[in-house]
């Protein structure tokens, strides 16, 4: 490779000193020559900044005036970063020193690929795929996200079964390697999302703009997960359900959204009712609040979330069936059981 693209590894932090202490040392071992590590601080109230000043004085820190969340936090920061590629990296991710090179090689070999992700394994159990992306994200016809190596809450062991580079629907927000030009072309993350599912929405818009997303399993990272909002947190449940509906309303063709969104709301309410029956009232209320917030968005904010769209053809990484039925009724636990010959 004659040209050595510039890579900016950008880590968003909010009151995450403990994660910086634990995971930043591995990132600083990155061996790719033309890279810069940038910490974006979402107005932390802990001593993250003093820790960085004392232990990593050479790292660039971008200070934001308030906690903008994941979406706007990155949008604000990346306006100030000049690089060929952005490595959007969660603060709770451990990496190998040579993790960047395979992704640069893949992206440089195919200019139609706008973003890719490494294989994401669990930091707690490094034999397992991790929930947030695993070996590359897919989506079903009703907007349920899943991944190669993770279907709903079931994460597979990694035996190299997904080690072939392949096109996917979405790239993990825990470790997203993206062309800076494309990120700005599609207007970055939707800031209304605040956090959760914003990377899937971004990747959907990237495909609508005519680009592709890919896995890059030759690069491997280890994600702790749940650093800011642990799984099961009602705030996380609310954001996931609200943002998923907004994403469908924004990106589905008109001929599909009129029936898919009501059916998706029905499926959500089935899940909420199940939560109520087993005594999880918080889960039930979070979904109801998410639906009310979605209705509010439709009436008052939908016009603010208009992004360029150019492609109407088939999207890659879409499972054109009902994942809920296949998983919970037919008992298909793993990606290969669900998708079979479609990847």
Residue ranges and their predicted role:
Residues 163-220:
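A short, conserved alpha-helix in the catalytic core of glycosyltransferases
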Residues 137, 141-147, 152-178, 200-202, ...:
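A recurrent flexible, glycine/aromatic-enriched loop bordering the glycosyltransferase active site
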Residues 63-81, 91-93, 102:
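Glycine-rich, basic loop-to-helix element that forms the pyrophosphate-binding segment
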Residues 86:
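Short aromatic/hydrophobic "clamp" motif used to bind/position activated sugar donors
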Residues 21, 46-54:
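Acidic helix N-cap motif at the loop->helix transition within catalytic regions
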Residues 25-34:
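Short, acidic, metal-binding catalytic loop of nucleotide-sugar glycosyltransferases
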Residues 93-144:
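Conserved donor NDP-sugar-binding/catalytic core segment of glycosyltransferases
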Residues 10, 209-329:
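Active-site-adjacent helix/loop segment of glycosyltransferases
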């Amino acid at each position: 490779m004659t040209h050595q693209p510039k890579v900016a590894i950008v880590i968003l932090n909010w009151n995450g000193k403990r994660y910086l202490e634990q995971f930043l040392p591995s990132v600083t071992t990155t061996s790719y020559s033309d890279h810069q590590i940038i910490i974006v601080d979402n107005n932390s109230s802990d001593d993250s900044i003093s820790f960085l000043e004392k232990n990593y004085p050479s790292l660039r820190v971008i200070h934001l005036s308030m906690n903008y969340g994941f979406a706007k936090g990155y949008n604000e920061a990346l306006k100030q970063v000049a690089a060929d590629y952005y490595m959007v990296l969660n603060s709770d991710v451990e990496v190998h020193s040579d993790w960047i090179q395979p992704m640069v090689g893949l992206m440089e070999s195919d200019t139609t690929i706008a973003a890719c992700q490494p294989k994401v394994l669990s930091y707690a159990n490094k034999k397992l795929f991790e929930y947030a992306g695993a070996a590359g994200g897919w989506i079903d016809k009703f907007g349920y996200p899943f991944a190669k190596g993770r279907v709903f809450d079931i994460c597979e062991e990694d035996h190299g079964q997904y080690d072939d580079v392949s096109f996917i629907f979405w790239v993990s927000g825990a470790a997203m390697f993206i062309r800076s030009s494309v990120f700005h072309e599609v207007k970055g993350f939707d800031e209304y999302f605040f956090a959760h599912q914003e990377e899937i929405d971004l990747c959907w818009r990237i495909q609508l703009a005519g680009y592709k997303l890919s896995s890059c399993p030759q690069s491997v990272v280890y994600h702790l997960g749940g650093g800011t909002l642990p799984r099961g947190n009602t705030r996380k449940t609310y954001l996931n359900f609200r943002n998923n509906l907004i994403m469908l309303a924004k990106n589905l063709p008109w001929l599909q959204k009129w029936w898919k969104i009501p059916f998706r709301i029905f499926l959500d309410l089935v899940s909420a009712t199940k939560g109520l029956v087993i005594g999880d009232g918080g889960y039930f209320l979070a979904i109801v609040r998410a639906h009310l917030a979605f209705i509010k968005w439709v009436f008052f904010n939908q016009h603010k979330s208009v992004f360029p769209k150019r492609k109407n053809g088939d999207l890659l990484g879409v499972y054109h069936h009902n994942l809920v039925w296949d998983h919970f009724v037919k008992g298909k636990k793993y990606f290969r059981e669900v998708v079979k010959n479609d990847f």
